[in-house]
Amino acid sequence: MTDSIIMIMSETLGVSIDANTSQSTCEKWDSLQHLHIVLALEEFFDLSFEPEEIATMKDVATIEQLIQQKIKN
């Protein structure tokens, strides 16, 4: 799953990222790109995020945890 998330985020941001990437370490990850990332992840994984969840999506690990929780439910 991590590879899929990284692929989606890399394509959306137009830069190479890894599992340690966060908003604070990626200059291209601004608020507009954040929304693009969320939409791409929702489409790829066929799920929806709540506004509160979107606000916590600040790094790859947190995003993966959120997606895993949603898939289990």
Which residues make up each language-model segment?
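Thiotemplate assembly-line natural product biosynthesis machinery
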Residues: 1-17, 68-73
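Phosphopantetheine carrier-protein modules
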Residues: 11-28, 44-56
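Amphipathic alpha-helical interaction surfaces in cytosolic regulatory modules
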Residues: 30-38
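C-terminal structural segments of small proteins and small subunits
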Residues: 48-72
